[in-house]
């Protein structure tokens, strides 16, 4: 099964959060992948060149999955369906569409938004302290 990581999980890992690091170490047999939009969100959070290099080095440890045209179309449909009722954002719609397209599990703490997407396998990866 393909497994994607959302931005919030990767931010915890980058910050060295003990629960995130322990979970990542225990799940070493899993092959985690990162949707391209998540990688871009991480770069947007960088404040200087040192952070940018650190994030890029971290991202190089994962396979990044870029959306196909059909996934953009599905993201559009998700946005049209859920934007006014759940607040699902454009990045969240792309992440959901890519996850659905690959029948992947998505680990995130943003369950409120993603749970409205039918058929999406979404779970919290670990308990936050």
Regions found by a protein language model. Give the residues of each.
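Residues at secondary-structure transition points
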Residues: 18, 33, 37, 49-50, ...
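Short loop/helix-cap segments at secondary-structure boundaries that form the rim of catalytic
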Residues: 112-119
